[in-house]
Amino acid sequence: MRHSKTAISFFILVAVLGSQAGLIQDTVKEDRPFNPTIIHQGFQDSSDCCFSYASQIPCSRFIYYFPTSGGCTKPGIIFVTRKRKRVCANPSDQRVQTCISTLKLGPRSGNSAIA
């Protein structure tokens, strides 16, 4: 008889604690509403952004250029070589402005960010 009282007391205790744990978990879920992370860069063409500028600008190796998109953190001009390599340049640099005046504005293509 003593074991049955202990067992019943134990099951009542487990039932009470279990229901309390469920209430606490529901309260915690209600306190933190679902706020999905929004990544704004997905809507911008970050593949055509410059993160650094080349120090040497050999105009004779470039076939065309295009400016970076407006969503980039740094302004830039991307020059494309005959071998289709891309070179980022500072649009404020006088040498870059000279290259721009001699080259044609080209298409914006490719999917890799420029370092």
UniProtKB/Swiss-Prot annotation:
Keywords: Chemotaxis, Cytokine, Disulfide bond, Secreted, Signal. Disulfide bonds join C49-C72, C50-C88, C59-C99. The lineage of its organism: Eukaryota, Metazoa, Chordata, Craniata, Vertebrata. The keyword Magnesium does not apply. GO terms for molecular function: CCR chemokine receptor binding; chemokine activity. This is C-C motif chemokine 6. The keyword Secreted applies. It comes from Rattus norvegicus (Rat). The gene is Ccl6. Residues 1-21 form the signal peptide. It comes from the Eukaryota. One of its GO terms (biological process) is antimicrobial humoral immune response mediated by antimicrobial peptide. Belongs to the intercrine beta (chemokine CC) family. Gene3D superfamilies: 2.40.50.40. It holds the Pfam family IL8. It is found in: Secreted. One of its GO terms (cellular component) is extracellular space. Its main location: secreted.
